[in-house]
Design a protein with these regions (language model features):
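Phosphate-backbone binding interfaces of nucleic-acid-interacting proteins
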Residues: 1-197, 331, 350, 354, ...
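Short, hydrophobic beta-strand segments
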Residues: 3-8, 154-163, 215-223, 354-362, ...
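Glycine/proline-enriched, intrinsically flexible loops and inter-domain linkers
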Residues: 5, 24, 64, 188-284, ...
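Beta-rich nucleic-acid/ligand-interaction surfaces
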Residues: 40-44, 197-198, 446, 484-489, ...
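Conserved mixed alpha/beta core segments that line enzyme active sites in large multi-domain catalysts
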Residues: 48-78, 253-320
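Mobile "lid/hinge" segments at catalytic clefts and subdomain interfaces of large enzymes
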Residues: 113-123, 130-134, 151-155, 300-400, ...
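Extended, well-folded interaction surfaces typified by the phenylalanyl-tRNA synthetase beta subunit core
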Residues: 405-409, 413-569, 754-756, 766-787
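A carboxyl-terminal module marker
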Residues: 431-434, 444, 588, 601-787
Length: 787
């Protein structure tokens, strides 16, 4: 939110204050300030000028040759504005001066000398209007500095909206001014409000059909409005605070919202004669002020004229009842709606506005009348002929209870840890608008309405109010005397960190960070469908409307988008997936590891065995055991129908290794290959971790024996290994896969057997005996020696 210091000065005397230091105090005490902008700093030596003569440029249809009276002299100027004319008063930037675009100097333009520039509002940085030069009041004296006429100089600071979530009173300048008053110890001036008394017998009838979500609805009709352009001061303030000036009535509703934080809405009075606030009985199409037709469902609060919807309550008005430049009578709405209802409607409709952002914070219902009185005051100040044309209608359906908190001085001392005098406590709370009564060291504090909606509710909140204004930087810093205890991380998080170390340090993989929702357009490029996944309600972008049930599609998209940057690489991520819903209806959220190995030079088979090696390494390093693999049918359509294997720990499935389905693989890359790993981190973390058994290395020479075996179709590695494991050969140190080979449907592998003894060097005859027995056992399952 953008805040104008000039606006704040309307309510707090800041003379003598260091504004930058004051803003810093505001950051420490109230809300974070993200940036400070010095408006008007770039505008220098811009004065009132009067066009004395005008000639068309002899060689240009757009340029004009002017003489301009700037008070102490008459200067020449070449100007291309379409609205320039003789006798016109303009904002003239003299040579040596500055505008937003830069310094102005004497120059020759199209062959003629120009000693300055006639400025548009955009060039002065006070609006986006750039269709012509700025026209000034004819009564302004030539040569008068433009800054003496308009509040161009200002300091605007930007407050982080997240800091204001629990402070609905700070969504307007008056609430910020109250904070500044408390920080400086100065008086907060009251708002200048109008009296709403009227001789008119007219009434704008209001019917509240939904009293649960409509807390208060106030409205009033005004007529005989003849002025339609806002004063420059109001337009500049709106522009500096991020609003686009439109017309007087629209500008004033925005002005009041920025001033006190209360949204208002002005309806064309010729189109409104009986207001009803309720939810529709069935879904309807409604066109809002931005020209977009939206579907309002039966949970959306609407404003009706009789039975015709004219606005979405708390969010935006309708196109058919909007005020235009020449509107002369309005019905002003100032209401208070349930913030949760407004937020949900805003989310469903995909429409978030400045008004809805404020209603979401649970505004003070007492502001509705303040806003109407302020609107009437401003309209009458600008247009003296405007009149109140109805009685005030004020339907107050639901009031917040008054909150009174009682505590003693000892409570303050205990929770602050310092001595703050009774006088300072009373003074601080009074400046913030709290009612305070103190008797015998016991304080009775009445919370003001603008802090009672969801902000200050318990005694500890009062302590916060006292200490933040006192200044946290005024507390004496002391070293903690409590014992320091180590932080215990969740086992699955520690396991995740260990896996990351293995993948990065041993296999040089790259970690990816992605969103849990699916980008359906990107998935579709790879032929991956996610329509059966858990869906997100009220999503603004329909392409991101489902949650992933596997880490791998996200990683495959990343591989697809980066396939041209490297020939071979591995990427991984540990993230959340949603595996359907539980019996209680909640999402079944799990933490999974996903790995994609991609290569344009290695075959799918080589990548598959590398994936097996990666899984083996993870198990050996963390669980100190080897995993088991079992062929399974694919769970996802993008998995290879044959080359998919479950990863087992203690007989329980904790993940899988798979190649891609040929159709998906061709869409990923026609010449490259990809193999995937996915593991449930939670299940893997819960699996048994075996003790590390130290086996002293043998001092004797090891004996290696390579066997090239021809496998029958369907034989698994587990079936092979069971044959030599059952022999319990103590001297068999390890068995490793060295190579694989396939030709004409026949598959062969090469295994390296390593034998070693601690007390002797093995004889070749002894080793050969074991090998012969292994071959004999393998022959029983259809495995033969390749010759």
């Amino acid at each position: 939110m953008l805040v104008s210091i000039n606006w704040i000065r309307d309510y707090v005397d800041l003379d003598g204050c260091d504004i930058k230091e004051l803003i810093n105090k505001f950051t420490l005490a109230t809300a974070e300030v993200e940036d400070i902008y010095y408006m008007g700093r770039d505008v220098q030596k811009v004065v009132v000028g009067e066009i004395k003569t005008l000639e068309n440029h002899p060689e240009s249809k757009k340029l004009h040759l002017l003489t301009v009276d700037i008070g102490d002299r008459v200067v020449n100027c070449v100007c291309g504005a379409p609205n320039v004319r003789v006798g016109q008063k303009v904002a003239f930037a003299t040579a040596g001066g500055r505008v937003v675009a830069g310094e102005i100097s004497k120059a020759t333009v199209a062959g003629y000398e120009s000693e300055g520039m006639c400025c548009s509002e955009k060039e002065l940085g006070i609006s986006d209007e750039n269709s012509g030069i700025m026209e000034l009041d004819p009564s302004y004296k030539n040569g008068t500095d433009i800054k003496e006429l308009f509040p161009i100089d200002d300091i605007v600071f930007e407050v982080d909206n997240k800091s204001l979530t629990n402070r609905p009173d700070l969504w307007g300048h008056y609430g910020i001014a109250r904070e500044f008053a408390a920080l400086t110890g100065r008086e907060l001036k009251p708002l200048d409000l109008a009296d709403l008394d009227s001789d008119s017998e007219n009434v704008v009838p209001v019917t509240i059909g939904d009293t649960e979500h409509v807390f208060r609805y106030s409205c009033l009709r005004m007529a005989n409005i003849t002025k339609h352009v806002s004063p420059m001061e109001i337009r500049i303030r709106l522009f500096y605070c991020g609003m686009r000036p439109i017309n007087l009535l629209a500008d004033l509703t925005n002005y009041i919202m920025l001033e006190i934080g209360q949204p208002t809405h002005a309806f064309d009075a010729t189109k409104i004669d009986h207001i009803k606030v309720d939810m529709p009985k069935e879904d309807i199409d409604f066109t809002t002020l931005d020209g977009t037709t939206r579907k309002a469902d039966t949970n959306t609060l609407l404003i009706y004229n009789h039975d015709e919807p004219v606005a979405i309550a708390g969010i935006m008005g309708g196109l058919d009842s909007e005020i235009v430049g020449d509107t002369s009578s309005v019905v002003l709405e100032s209401a208070n709606f349930d913030g949760i209802c407004v937020r949900k409607s805003s989310s469903r409709l995909g429409l978030r506005t400045d008004a809805s952002a404020r209603y979401e914070k649970m505004l003070d219902p007492e502001l509705t009348l303040v806003a109407i009185k302020r609107f009437v005051k401003l309209v009458k100040d600008i247009d003296s002929g405007a009149v109140i044309d109805s009685k005030l209608t004020d339907e107050y359906a639901k009031k917040y209870p008054q909150i009174t908190l009682t505590f003693d001085k000892a409570y303050v001392d205990r929770y602050t840890g310092i001595e703050i005098s009774n006088e300072r406590i009373i003074h601080t709370l009074t400046l913030l608008g709290f009612g305070v009564d103190e008797k015998d060291g016991v304080f009775t504090v009445t919370v003001p309405s603008w802090r009672a909606t969801k902000d200050v509710t318990i005694k500890a909140d009062i302590i916060e109010e006292i200490t933040r204004i006192y200044g946290y930087d005024n507390f004496e810093i002391t070293t903690t005397r409590s014992p320091l205890k180590p932080v215990h991380s969740a086992p699955e998080r520690l396991v995740g960190d260990e896996i990351k170390d293995i993948l990065v340090k041993k296999y040089s993989m790259h970690e990816v960070h992605s969103y849990i929702w699916c980008d359906k357009k990107k998935y579709k490029k790879l032929g991956i469908e996610v329509e059966d996944n858990v869906k997100i309600l009220n999503i603004e972008n329909s392409d991101n409307g489902v949650l992933r049930d596997s880490m791998l599609p996200t990683l495959l998209v990343a591989a697809y988008e980066n396939k041209d940057f490297a020939d071979s690489y591995g990427i991984f991520e540990i993230g959340r997936v949603i595996e359907g819903t539980l019996e209680n209806g909640y999402c079944n959220e799990r933490r999974h590891l996903g790995v994609v190995l991609f290569s344009k030079s290695q075959s799918e088979r080589d990548l598959y065995y590398k994936a097996i090696e990666v899984v083996n390494c993870i198990f050996e390093q963390i669980k100190h055991c080897a995993p088991k693999f079992a062929k399974i049918a694919p769970v996802h359509a993008w998995q290879h129908p044959k080359n998919t294997a479950a990863v087992l720990a203690d007989g329980n499935e904790v993940g899988f290794v798979c190649a891609l389905h040929p159709q998906n693989a061709s869409k990923l890359d026609k010449t490259g290959s990809a193999v995937c790993i996915e593991m449930d981190i939670d299940k893997f973390s819960d699996a048994k971790a075996y003790d590390i058994e130290f086996k002293e290395p043998s001092t004797k020479q090891s004996t290696y024996y390579d066997l090239s075996l021809v496998l029958r179709k369907g034989v698994t590695y587990d079936e092979l290994s069971e044959n030599w494991k059952s022999m319990n050969i103590e001297e068999l140190e390890s068995v490793k896969l060295i190579d694989t080979y396939e030709l004409l449907g026949t598959k062969s592998i090469t295994l390296r057997f390593t034998f070693s003894s601690h007390d002797r060097t093995l004889e070749m005859e002894e080793v050969q005996g074991w090998i012969d027995e292994i071959l004999h056992r393998l022959s029983a399952i259809g495995v033969s020696l390749r010759v």
